[in-house]
Amino acid sequence: MIIIGLIGRIGAGKSTVAARFAAHGGHVIDADRIAHEVLEEPDVIRQVANRFGADVLDVDGRIRRRDVADRVFGPTPDHARALEWLESLVHPRVRSRINAEMVALEARDEGRIPPERGTVVVLDVPLLVQAGWADRCDRLIVVNCSEEVRRQRLAARHWNPAQQEAREAAWDRNYSAAMLPSEKLSSVDASGDLAYTHSQVDLIWSGLSG
């Protein structure tokens, strides 16, 4: 099994790169998708409602993520404490699910004859380095994007300024490119030309070996 980790700011184009790997047969583990699933767990719903109030739930009793985001992303100490609490609730569950998925994939690979390269796993995890996933990866791909294009993508998400600033600050916290082992690094430019972005991913894929 080969594990590839994607690194990049919000709006850089990590999902586009992940989708191209998936088109080649890579197995993408999308932490955002898993986090959304975690927020549907009854115990998590109960704790979130207790912390933020029942008005963050819709008529079906599901968490309205945008309402929760308003409470955890912002400039005040209360926002910071709320975000820390939410992360302490959600992140361990997300990590557990990712680990379980990777264990299952590795077990499946062990039964292959011949083993060949095995599954290529792509970790699409926000704050991959800051969350400690980089050490698990065989390859790290930094997804770059022009600031102008990235800002356009973020505008399309309709986050309020406080939410965007808090998410950007989360990236800046405890991150330095110097932390990354150069022997694992590749980069992809995802500034806009989809065919060009795909061609870079294709080249990386063709060079993978087990």
Kindly give the residue locations of the regions a language model identified.
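ATP-binding Walker
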Residues: 12
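Hydrophobic anchor at the beta1->P-loop junction of P-loop NTPases
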Residues: 6
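P-loop (Walker A) phosphate-binding loop of NTP-binding proteins
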Residues: 9, 21
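ATP-dependent small-molecule kinase phosphotransfer cores
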Residues: 36-119
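ATP-dependent NMP and nucleoside kinases share a basic, alpha-helical "lid"
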Residues: 99-107, 111-155
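Small-molecule kinase domains that catalyze NTP-dependent phosphoryl transfer to phosphate-bearing small molecules
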Residues: 134-136, 155-210
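Walker A/P-loop
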Residues: 15
